[in-house]
C-alpha cells in the first residue's frame, strides 16, 4: 500500500499568501531555464527522462507536444513496472518526482506536461479513443506516484495564482487543477480534500469560483460530507461565494438535515442577493426539497422572493423608451439584456423543477391555496399558477380548481392580473398557448366572474405579448365566437371590442381572422351580431386617410348581399349590420382645430355615405312590416347608445318625423273611411279634443286594411304599396322620440301631444258579446288590443322621465290604461287558444317563439276528465299551425302581419273560464325601459284639466294604485331575474336553435349589469315606502279590533293584488341583494348604498358606518315584516331575502337562529287557500322552507323529532282532509315533502359528524354516543312511518336515504363504538339493538319491492342489501376487537312485507332452513343483553336470507 503523503507544507494561510505574492513579483525569466530548440527532444539523462522514454513517451522542448508512442494504458503499466522493478525502489520514486520537478521549472515544459500528448500516427489507428491525456494526468493514474505528483502540483499553483492569463488564453492554475478531475482512483482523498480547501481559502475570487465548482469532479463520495461542512463555513464567512458553493451542494451527496440547515441560511439572505445570483440560489432551494418539507419551503420561498427583482425588466423597458426618444438608449442596452436573461434563467430553473418534481408543483399550489386574503396575494402567485398550468400536465385540474375558487372568493382581481402580466411578460410569453387554453377552459364555466377572468387572460396576453402571440389570441377568440356557447361567444366578442380600443392598429393586422366570423352569423343572437359588425366597422373606418379600405369594401358587399336576400333571417342580419356600420361612420368625433377644412370635407363625405346606406336599408325594408320594425328598433338603439354627428342626426330626425306624421297621425275631425265590422271611435284620449286642432292615431283603419287582405297573398309576396304598416307604429314612435330627445337634451315638448291623443278604435271591452263573436272578429279585436297595449307601453317609455306634474299625471293615466288593456287581453286570449299575436318587437330571438296556450288549464281539464282527448288534439293542432306560421321565415321574406287566427271558424262548444298567463306572450309585448320604474317615485299627482282657452277647468288627483304598482313590479322582477340571477343553461349544439331566456329583454341586455343595479338601488327608497304601506295594510287587516264591516270592505281581488305586490317587492329586494356581483371589489360601493337605504329606515345612518353594522340594521328592518306576511310565498321570499343578507355577514351565526324561528313560524301557520298544497309550485316552496328551517336550526335532530313525534301523530289521528294542528302545513298531500326533507337532512347531519379518536376524552365519547342515539331514534321513527304511509314516494325515500344512513353509520359511528364498547357497553348495545330493528324493516322493504316488481324501487335493493351485509361484518369485527367473538351469531330472517306478514311465495322450500324463527332469534337479543349485564361480554346480530337462499344481513 502506498504510504499517505504529508499534506501541503504551509505553516498557515498567511505564510502561503506571502509566498505566493513574492513569487508573483519575480519575473518569469528567473523562474525558468532557457528552453531548448523548438523541435528538439529532451535528452536529459535523468531517471525521469529515461524511464519515460523506456515506457513509450518522448519529451519535447519548446511549444511542441510530448509524444506518446504507445497506448495510454500500456504506458502507465510499463512505467509502473519499471518503477517497481527498479533496483533502488522505492527511492527511485523520489528521484523520478525530483526529475519531474526540475523539468517543470521551465514554464513551457510545465505547460507541455499539463497539455495533452501527441500520439504517433501508427499508434492512433489502434486506439479506441482519439482523446489523449496529458503527462501529468497519466502519472496521476499511477498509484505509487499520485501523492507526490499531487503535492508537487499544489506547490506549483501558488506561483501562478496572481498571474494574468497568457497570450493564448490559458490559465495555469485552472490547467493545473483540471489534472485532478475525474481520476480513476484517489489514493489519499482526505489529504487531497484538505489541500483543495486550503487552496480555495487563499485563491483570488475569480479562481475561488472555479476551484469550488470543480470539487465534485475532483473529490470522491467519501469526502462529500467533509467538503460540505467546510464549504458551509466558507459560505457564512464570504457571501460572494454563495452561488458557486450552492451550485456544488446540488452535486454533492449530503445529509438532508445538513441541506435543510443550509437552505435556512440561504433563505434568510434571499431578499438581499443580486438578481444574477437568484437562479442558482432558487435552484438549490428547490433541489433540496423533500416530500415532507416541500410545502413549508415553497411557502417561505414565495414570501422571500422580492418582487422588485421581477419588476426591473418592465422598469427598464419604460425607461428605455424614454431614453430612445432622447437618443440615449444605447448605454443601458447591455444591462437590460443581462437582467432579462437573469429573469428568464430564474424561471427556467423553476419550470424545470416543476416539470420533473410533482411534489414541488403540488406544494406551490397548496401554498397559494392557503392564502385567504386578497391583499396577501402577489403577482408571483398568479404567474406561478399560469406557469404550473403550462409546464406540469399532471396538475392542470388542480390549477383550474384553485383559480376558480380564488376568482369566486374575489382573491384574484383584475388589478392583480394586470400587474402579473406587466411584471412577468417575458416569462409568460413563452407559455402563451397554455394561457389561451386555460382561458378556453374558464370560458366554459357558468359563473360570469370566471368567464370574465378568462376574458382578461386573453386581453392582457394581447396587450403585453408580441405580434405572433397577438395573432394567436385573436385566433383563439374567433374560435370562441364560433363555438356556439352563448356565454362564451359574448365574452369573446367583448374582449375583441376591448382590444380594438386598446390597440386598433394591431387588430387591423388580424382583420382577416375576424372577417371569418361573418360565416356564422345565422346562429347568433342580435346582440352578438351587433358586436360583430361593430368590431368590423370600427376596424374598417378607423384607418388613417389614404390607407387601403378593403375592409370597408367587404363590409358593404356583405351587407348589400344580406339586405337583398329573400330569406327573412338574413335580411334582419343585414339590417343590424347596416345600422351598426352607419352608426360607426356617423359617430360624432372631436376633430383638431387646425384641420377644420379637411375634417369638414371628410364629414360631408361620410354624411353622404351614411344617408345613402340608410336609404338603401329603407328601400329594402319598406315593403316588409317586420323588417321595417326591426330597422326602426335598431336605429333607435343606435341613437340611444351613440352620439351621431349633428348633421346626420338632423337629417334622420326630420325624415322620421315626417314619415310618422304622414303614416299614422290624422286630424281629429277626419272621418275614418271603410267598411268596419265595429263602430269606430276616438278612444283613450286624456283630454277633450277640439275638432279643429286635435290629432288621433289612425290605428283601426290602417290595421283593418291589412287584416282584410288574404294571408296567402301577404306571405307569398311583398306588398307593392308603400303605406306604413301599423305593426311599425310602436317601433317608429320609439325612434322618433329618441331622435327628438337627443336633439333637445331630453325635452319632448315637440311630440307631447302623442301622450294624450286618442286612437281610432272600436270599443275593445268585449263584455257579453265575446261569446257571440266570430273567430275572425275575435282575432281582429285581440290584435287591436295588442297594438294599443304596445303603443301605450312605448308612450310610457317615452314620457316617464318628464318632470312636470301634468306630464306625470298623464303617464300614470296611461299606466292605468295598460292595466285595463291587460285584463281585456286575458279575456280575448282565453277564448282564442290558437291565436298568434302580431309581432311588434322583432329580432332573431323571437323568430321561433311559439306562444304557449295554457298548459295548466289543459292539465286541469284532463284531471277532471272533461274533453281531455279533444283538448289534447286541439293543442297539437295549434302547435302545428303556429309552427307553420313561424317557420315561413326560412323561405319567404315576410309573414302574416295581422296575427289573426289560422283557424277561421267559430268556436263551438263552451268551456269553463280559462286562465291565461300573459307571461307566455312576453315576446309580443314592447319592452319597458328601466327608466320607466322612476314612476315608483310618484306619490299623489295633481293633473290639471284645461279648457279650449288653456285655462284650468278642473283638477284631478292621480296616484299609483295597487294594480299599477303590481304591473311595474312584475316587470321589474322579471328584468332582475333575467339579468342578476345566473342562468345555468347547458351547452347546446351550434347548428340548433337555442331557446333564449332573453326574449323580451333585448334593450335590457344592452345595458351593463352594474348600471341596472345602480338604477334599482336608486329605487330602493320608494320601494321601501310601498313595502311599508303594504305592511301597514295587512297589519291593520289582521288587527283584532278591526270591525267585521271594515274587513268585509276588503275584496278578495284587493287582497290578492296587495299580497302580490308584497311578494314582488320581496322578490325584487332578494334579486338585488342576492346578486353575486356584490362580492367584486368594484361593486362594494353599490352594496353599501343599498344597505344604507334599508338601515336608514330604522334610524339615521352615519357616514362611514361599518358594513357589518349596516347588515345588522338591514336585517332587523326586514325581519320586522314577518308580522304582516299575507301568504306562504311572501314568507318564503322574506326568508330568502334575510338569507341573502346573512351570506354577506362575517358573523352569520348570530342571526341563524332567528331565521330558523321565522321558518318554523311559517310552517306552524295555517295559510288561506288550503287547496294550494296540491299545486306543484306550493310543494316546491314548502320543500325550500323546510330545508331552510332544518339547515338553520341549532339542533336538527331535535327539530326532526318534534315534527315526527308531534306533527305526524296529529296528522295520523286527524280526518282525511285535515292537517296537523301544530304544523298546519303538514297534510297528507305534503307528508311526502316533509318526509323526504327530514330523511335527507338526517343523513346530511350524521354524515358530517366526526368519528372521533380513542385519545378523545370520555366526555367527548359520551356526547358523541348521545348524539348518535338521538340520530338512530329519529331514523327509527321515520322508517316506521312507512307502515302508515306506504306510497311509492315514501318507500323510495326510505330505500335511498336508508342506505345512505347505514353507510354513514358504518363510516362515522362504528369507529366510535370500537373504542367505546368497553366503557359504555350498555349504551352501545342499546344503540345497536335500535338500529337492528330499523334494518329489519329495511329488509322487509326490499322484499316488498321485489314481490311487487316495482323497478323504480328494486333498483335500490342491491346497494341497500350490500350496505346491510357490510354492517353485519363490521359489528362482528367490533366484537372481535373487544374480545367478544362468542357473542356474535348468524341466523336466517324470513321475508316479510311492510306489515310483518310472511311472504309465502318466498318461503324457503327446505324445512331445515326455517328455524324457530330467526325473528325470535333476533328478538332474543334482549335476553342476551341481560346475560351480558350479568357479566358475559356477548352481543348478537342477525343475517337475513332472500328467496334465492343468498345471505342478506341486517343488524
Swiss-Prot record:
GO terms for molecular function: DNA polymerase binding. One of its GO terms (biological process) is neuronal stem cell population maintenance. Residues 858-879, 1399-1451 are annotated as: Disordered. Residues 1430-1451 have a biased composition (Acidic residues). Monoubiquitinated on Lys-561 during S phase and upon genotoxic stress by FANCL in complex with E2 ligases UBE2T or UBE2W. Deubiquitinated by USP1 as cells enter G2/M, or once DNA repair is completed. Monoubiquitination requires the joint intervention of the FANC core complex, including FANCA, FANCB, FANCC, FANCE, FANCF, FANCG, and FANCM, and proteins involved in cell cycle checkpoints and DNA repair, including RPA1, ATR, CHEK1 and BRCA1, and is mediated by FANCL/PHF9. Monoubiquitination prevents DNA release from the FANCI-FANCD2 complex. Phosphorylated on several sites including Ser-222 and Ser-1401 in response to genotoxic stress by ATM and/or ATR. The keyword Nucleus applies. Residues 860-871 have a biased composition (Basic residues). GO terms for cellular component: condensed chromosome; DNA repair complex; nucleus. The modification Phosphoserine is found at residues 222, 716, 1257, 1406, 1414. Residues 248-359 are annotated as: Interaction with BRCA2. Signal peptide: none annotated. It comes from the Eukaryota. It is found in: Nucleus. Residues 1-291 are annotated as: Interaction with FANCE. Homodimer; cannot be ubiquitinated and does not bind DNA. Part of a FANCI-FANCD2 heterodimeric complex that binds and scans dsDNA for DNA damage. Interacts directly with FANCE and FANCI. Interacts with USP1 and MEN1. The ubiquitinated form specifically interacts with BRCA1 and BLM. Both the nonubiquitinated and the monoubiquitinated forms interact with BRCA2; this interaction is mediated by phosphorylated FANCG and the complex also includes XCCR3. The ubiquitinated form specifically interacts with MTMR15/FAN1 (via UBZ-type zinc finger), leading to recruit MTMR15/FAN1 to sites of DNA damage. Required for maintenance of chromosomal stability. Promotes accurate and efficient pairing of homologs during meiosis. Involved in the repair of DNA double-strand breaks, both by homologous recombination and single-strand annealing. The FANCI-FANCD2 complex binds and scans double-stranded DNA (dsDNA) for DNA damage; this complex stalls at DNA junctions between double-stranded DNA and single-stranded DNA. May participate in S phase and G2 phase checkpoint activation upon DNA damage. This is Fanconi anemia group D2 protein homolog. The lineage of its organism: Eukaryota, Metazoa, Chordata, Craniata, Vertebrata. The gene is Fancd2.
Amino acid at each position: 500500500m502506498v504510504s499517505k503523503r504529508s499534506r501541503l507544507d504551509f505553516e498557515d494561510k498567511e505564510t502561503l499568501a506571502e509566498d505566493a505574492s513574492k513569487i508573483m513579483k519575480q519575473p518569469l525569466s528567473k523562474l525558468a531555464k532557457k528552453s531548448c530548440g523548438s523541435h528538439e527532444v529532451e535528452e536529459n539523462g535523468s531517471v525521469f527522462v529515461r524511464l519515460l522514454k523506456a515506457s513509450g513517451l518522448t519529451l519535447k522542448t519548446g511549444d511542441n507536444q510530448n509524444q506518446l508512442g504507445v497506448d495510454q494504458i500500456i504506458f502507465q503499466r510499463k512505467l509502473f513496472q519499471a518503477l517497481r522493478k527498479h533496483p533502488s525502489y522505492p527511492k527511485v520514486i523520489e528521484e523520478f518526482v525530483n526529475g519531474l520537478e526540475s523539468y517543470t521549472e521551465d514554464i513551457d515544459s510545465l505547460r507541455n506536461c499539463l497539455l495533452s500528448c501527441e500520439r504517433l500516427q501508427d499508434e492512433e489507428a489502434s486506439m479506441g479513443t482519439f482523446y489523449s491525456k496529458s503527462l501529468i494526468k497519466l502519472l496521476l493514474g499511477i498509484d505509487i506516484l499520485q501523492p507526490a505528483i499531487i503535492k508537487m502540483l499544489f506547490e506549483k499553483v501558488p506561483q501562478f495564482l496572481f498571474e494574468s492569463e497568457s497570450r493564448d488564453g490559458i490559465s495555469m492554475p485552472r490547467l493545473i487543477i483540471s489534472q485532478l478531475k475525474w481520476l480513476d482512483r484517489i489514493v489519499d482523498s482526505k489529504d487531497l480534500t484538505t489541500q483543495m480547501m486550503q487552496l480555495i481559502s487563499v485563491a483570488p475570487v475569480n479562481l475561488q469560483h472555479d476551484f469550488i465548482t470543480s470539487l465534485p469532479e475532483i473529490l470522491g463520495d467519501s469526502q462529500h460530507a467533509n467538503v460540505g461542512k467546510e464549504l458551509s463555513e466558507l459560505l457564512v464567512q464570504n457571501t460572494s461565494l454563495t452561488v458557486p458553493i450552492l451550485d456544488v451542494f446540488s452535486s454533492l451527496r449530503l445529509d438532508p438535515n445538513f441541506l435543510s440547515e443550509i437552505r435556512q441560511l440561504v433563505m434568510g439572505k434571499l431578499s438581499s442577493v443580486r438578481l444574477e445570483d437568484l437562479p442558482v440560489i432558487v435552484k438549490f432551494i428547490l433541489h433540496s426539497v423533500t416530500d415532507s418539507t416541500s410545502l413549508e419551503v415553497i411557502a417561505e420561498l414565495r414570501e422571500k422572493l422580492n418582487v422588485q427583482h421581477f419588476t426591473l425588466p418592465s422598469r427598464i423597458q419604460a425607461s428605455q423608451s424614454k431614453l430612445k426618444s432622447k437618443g440615449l438608449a444605447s448605454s443601458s442596452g447591455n444591462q437590460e439584456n443581462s437582467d432579462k436573461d437573469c429573469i428568464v434563467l430564474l424561471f427556467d430553473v423553476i419550470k424545470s423543477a416543476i416539470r420533473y418534481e410533482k411534489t414541488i408543483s403540488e406544494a406551490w399550489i397548496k401554498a397559494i391555496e392557503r392564502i385567504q386574503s386578497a391583499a396577501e396575494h402577489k403577482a408571483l402567485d398568479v404567474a406561478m399558477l399560469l406557469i404550473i398550468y403550462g409546464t406540469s400536465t399532471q396538475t392542470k385540474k388542480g390549477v383550474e380548481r384553485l383559480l376558480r375558487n380564488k376568482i369566486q372568493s374575489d382573491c384574484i382581481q383584475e388589478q392583480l392580473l394586470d400587474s402579473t402580466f406587466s411584471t412577468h411578460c417575458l416569462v409568460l410569453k413563452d407559455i402563451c398557448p397554455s394561457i389561451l387554453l386555460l382561458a378556453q377552459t374558464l370560458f366554459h364555466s357558468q359563473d360570469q366572474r370566471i368567464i370574465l377572468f378568462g376574458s382578461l387572460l386573453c386581453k392582457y396576453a394581447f396587450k403585453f405579448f408580441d405580434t405572433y402571440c397577438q395573432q394567436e389570441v385573436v385566433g383563439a377568440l374567433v374560435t370562441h365566437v364560433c363555438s356556439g356557447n352563448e356565454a362564451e361567444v359574448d365574452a369573446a366578442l367583448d374582449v375583441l371590442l376591448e382590444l380594438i380600443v386598446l390597440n386598433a392598429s394591431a387588430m387591423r393586422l388580424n382583420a382577416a381572422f375576424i372577417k371569418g366570423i361573418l360565416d356564422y352569423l345565422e346562429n347568433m343572437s342580435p346582440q352578438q351580431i351587433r358586436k360583430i359588425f361593430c368590431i368590423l366597422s370600427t376596424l374598417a373606418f378607423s384607418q388613417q386617410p389614404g390607407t387601403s379600405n378593403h375592409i370597408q369594401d367587404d363590409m358593404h358587399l356583405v351587407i348589400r348581399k344580406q339586405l337583398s336576400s329573400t330569406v327573412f333571417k338574413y335580411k334582419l342580419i343585414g339590417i343590424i349590420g347596416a345600422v351598426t356600420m352607419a352608426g360607426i361612420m356617423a359617430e360624432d368625433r372631436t376633430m383638431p382645430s387646425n384641420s377644420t377644412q379637411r375634417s369638414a370635407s371628410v364629414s360631408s363625405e361620410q354624411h353622404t355615405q351614411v344617408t345613402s346606406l340608410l336609404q338603401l336599408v329603407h328601400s329594402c325594408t319598406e315593403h316588409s312590416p317586420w323588417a321595417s320594425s326591426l330597422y326602426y328598433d335598431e336605429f333607435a338603439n343606435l341613437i340611444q347608445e351613440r352620439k351621431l354627428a349633428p348633421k346626420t342626426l338632423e337629417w334622420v330626425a326630420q325624415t322620421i318625423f315626417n314619415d310618422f306624421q304622414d303614416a299614422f297621425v290624422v286630424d281629429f275631425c277626419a272621418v275614418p273611411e271603410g267598411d268596419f265590422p265595429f263602430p269606430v271611435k276616438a278612444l283613450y284620449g286624456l283630454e277633450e279634443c277640439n275638432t279643429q286642432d286635435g290629432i288621433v292615431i289612425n290605428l283601426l283603419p290602417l290595421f283593418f286594411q291589412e287584416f282584410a287582405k288574404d294571408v296567402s297573398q301577404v306571405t307569398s309576396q311583398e306588398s307593392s304599396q308603400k303605406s306604413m304598416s301599423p305593426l311599425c307604429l310602436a317601433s317608429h314612435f320609439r325612434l322618433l322620440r329618441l331622435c327628438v330627445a337627443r336633439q333637445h337634451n331630453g325635452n319632448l315638448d315637440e311630440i307631447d301631444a302623442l301622450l294624450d291623443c286618442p286612437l281610432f278604435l272600436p270599443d275593445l271591452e268585449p263584455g257579453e258579446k265575446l261569446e257571440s263573436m266570430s273567430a275572425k272578429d275575435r282575432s281582429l279585436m285581440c290584435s287591436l288590443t295588442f297594438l294599443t297595449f304596445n303603443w301605450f307601453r312605448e308612450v310610457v317609455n317615452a314620457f316617464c322621465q318628464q318632470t312636470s306634474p301634468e306630464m306625470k299625471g298623464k303617464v300614470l293615466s296611461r299606466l292605468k290604461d295598460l292595466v285595463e288593456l291587460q285584463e281585456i287581453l286575458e279575456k280575448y286570449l282565453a277564448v282564442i287558444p290558437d291565436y298568434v299575436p302580431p309581432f311588434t318587437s322583432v329580432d332573431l330571438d323571437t323568430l321561433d317563439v311559439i306562444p304557449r296556450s295554457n298548459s295548466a288549464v289543459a292539465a286541469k281539464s284532463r284531471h277532471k276528465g272533461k274533453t281531455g282527448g279533444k283538448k289534447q288534439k286541439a293543442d297539437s293542432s295549434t302547435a302545428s299551425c303556429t309552427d307553420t306560421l313561424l317557420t315561413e321565415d326560412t323561405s319567404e321574406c315576410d309573414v302574416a302581419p295581422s296575427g289573426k287566427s289560422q283557424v277561421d271558424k267559430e268556436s263551438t262548444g263552451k268551456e269553463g273560464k280559462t286562465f291565461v298567463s300573459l307571461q307566455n306572450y312576453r315576446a309580443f309585448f314592447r319592452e319597458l325601459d328601466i327608466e320607466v320604474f322612476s314612476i315608483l317615485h310618484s306619490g299623489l299627482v295633481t293633473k290639471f284639466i284645461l279648457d279650449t282657452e288653456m285655462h284650468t277647468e278642473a283638477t284631478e288627483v292621480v296616484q299609483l294604485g295597487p294594480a299599477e304598482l303590481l304591473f311595474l313590479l312584475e316587470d321589474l322582477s322579471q328584468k332582475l331575474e333575467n339579468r342578476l340571477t345566473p342562468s345555468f343553461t347547458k351547452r347546446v349544439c351550434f347548428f340548433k336553435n337555442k331557446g333564449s331566456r332573453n326574449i323580451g329583454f333585448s334593450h335590457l341586455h344592452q345595458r351593463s349589469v352594474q348600471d341596472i343595479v345602480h338604477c334599482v338601488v336608486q329605487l330602493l327608497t320608494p320601494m321601501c315606502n310601498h313595502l311599508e304601506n303594504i305592511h301597514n295594510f295587512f297589519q291593520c287587516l289582521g288587527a283584532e279590533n278591526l270591525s267585521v264591516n271594515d274587513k268585509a270592505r276588503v275584496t278578495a281581488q284587493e287582497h290578492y293584488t296587495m299580497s302580490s305586490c308584497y311578494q314582488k317587492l320581496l322578490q325584487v329586494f332578494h334579486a338585488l341583494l342576492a346578486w353575486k356581483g356584490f362580492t367584486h371589489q368594484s361593486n362594494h360601493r353599490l352594496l353599501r348604498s343599498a344597505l344604507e337605504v334599508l338601515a336608514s329606515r330604522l334610524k339615521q345612518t352615519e357616514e362611514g358606518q361599518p358594513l357589518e353594522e349596516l347588515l345588522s340594521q338591514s336585517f332587523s328592518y326586514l325581519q320586522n315584516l314577518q308580522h304582516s306576511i299575507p301568504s306562504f310565498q311572501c314568507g318564503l321570499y322574506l326568508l330568502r331575502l334575510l338569507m341573502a343578507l346573512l351570506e354577506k355577514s362575517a358573523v352569520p351565526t348570530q342571526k341563524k337562529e332567528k331565521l330558523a324561528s321565522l321558518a318554523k313560524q311559517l310552517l306552524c301557520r295555517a295559510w288561506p287557500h288550503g287547496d294550494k298544497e296540491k299545486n306543484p309550485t306550493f310543494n316546491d316552496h314548502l320543500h325550500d322552507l323546510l330545508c331552510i328551517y332544518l339547515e338553520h336550526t341549532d339542533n336538527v335532530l331535535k327539530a326532526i323529532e318534534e315534527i315526527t313525534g308531534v306533527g305526524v301523530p296529529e296528522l295520523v289521528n286527524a280526518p282525511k282532509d285535515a292537517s296537523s294542528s301544530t304544523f298546519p302545513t303538514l297534510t297528507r298531500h305534503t307528508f311526502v315533502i316533509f318526509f323526504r326533507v327530514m330523511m335527507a337532512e338526517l343523513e346530511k347531519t350524521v354524515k358530517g359528524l366526526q368519528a372521533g379518536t380513542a385519545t378523545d376524552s370520555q366526555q367527548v365519547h359520551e356526547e358523541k354516543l348521545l348524539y348518535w342515539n338521538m340520530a338512530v331514534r329519529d331514523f327509527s321513527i321515520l322508517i316506521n312511518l312507512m307502515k302508515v304511509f306506504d306510497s311509492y314516494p315514501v318507500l323510495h325515500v326510505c330505500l335511498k336515504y336508508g342506505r345512505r344512513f347505514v353507510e354513514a353509520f358504518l363510516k362515522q359511528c362504528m369507529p366510535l363504538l370500537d373504542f367505546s364498547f368497553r366503557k359504555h357497553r350498555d349504551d352501545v348495545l342499546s344503540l345497536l339493538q335500535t338500529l337492528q330493528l330499523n334494518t329489519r324493516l329495511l329488509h322487509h322493504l326490499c322484499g316488498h319491492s321485489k314481490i311487487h316488481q316495482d323497478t323504480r324501487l328494486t333498483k335500490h335493493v342491491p346497494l341497500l342489501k350490500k350496505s346491510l351485509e357490510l354492517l353485519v361484518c363490521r359489528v362482528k369485527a367490533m366484537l372481535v376487537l373487544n374480545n367478544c367473538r362468542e357473542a356474535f351469531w348468524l341466523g336466517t330472517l324470513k321475508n316479510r312485507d311492510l306489515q310483518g306478514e310472511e311472504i309465502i311465495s318466498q318461503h324457503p322450500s327446505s324445512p331445515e332452513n326455517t328455524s324457530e324463527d330467526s325473528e325470535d332469534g333476533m328478538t332474543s337479543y334482549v335476553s342476551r343483553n341481560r346475560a351480558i349485564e350479568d357479566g358475559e361480554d356477548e352481543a348478537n346480530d342477525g343475517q337475513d336470507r332472500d328467496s334465492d337462499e343468498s345471505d342478506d344481513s341486517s343488524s
